[in-house]
Amino acid sequence: MARIDEAAQRLGLSEDALMESAGAAVTEVALTELGRLGEHAAGPGGPLARPPLVVVLCGPGNNGGDGLVAARRLATAGRSVLMALVADASRQTGAATAHNWNVLQAMAAAGSLELFVAPTPELLLRLRERIAEATLLVDALLGSGASGPLREPIATAVDLVNATRTHARAAGRPCSVLAVDAPTRIDMTGGSHSTPVIESDVTVTFHRAKAGFALDREARRLAGRYLVAPIGIPLEAEEGIVPDDGEWPPSRITEVSWQEPVERAEAAHRAGGGIPAGPGRTD
């Protein structure tokens, strides 16, 4: 949604405000998912043996910035949080992202959360055992600006997320993956995906659903439950970008019910559930 983001900023909505709203939506969905997992664990197997660990994996762009906000908010809400920056810290150059990164560093120094920087696969693999303890994994690695084959250390992060989810399920332990905007890496315009690709249980995107998920059944499967969250973008920011069909973005977090079959020509304009399609936040 890069063009819409830029238009919203020209109207006076700051990048920091957009990122804060997106991170708040991710936090709300994460807390709901943790509640669901806790209820599941309270069945015959008994309650969770220890407080659930939330692992937030962040890439270097705006998508990662949304993850930084979510990590901060989850830690502030009293959750056990491990935040891993899967990039060189020097790439945190955007003003909003850099601000949130600085706040997280201060929180980590105070013991409010665990924070790691893993710009190489080798450093990321040192966290393998800790990541494997996660009850909820938040994928904030890449946004819509990514293209081509996955590069390291992102590819290793994708493998770790999928392995953690698979092994937890095999052991009967509650574990879910929450994707920010889209699982890494699904093309939000056409629905194609990288190899490897994260398989999520729930995806939260922002402002409007993305056409790629209406176009591709496999993309929908990989996304899991697909939620659209408002982040305060005015309709005026869409002028000349999203066709005006009279449909409004949701006023609260809303799950999309995809309509089958979806014609490609229609889906290029509408992303199911009456929500027009639009590009996602950049990586």
Q: Over which residues does each language-model region extend?
A:
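An N-terminal, well-structured beta->alpha segment
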Residues: 1-53, 259, 267-270, 280-283
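Electropositive phosphate-/nucleotide-binding environments in soluble metabolic enzymes
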Residues: 12, 16, 20-24, 68, ...
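Positions that flank functional sites
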Residues: 16, 89, 185
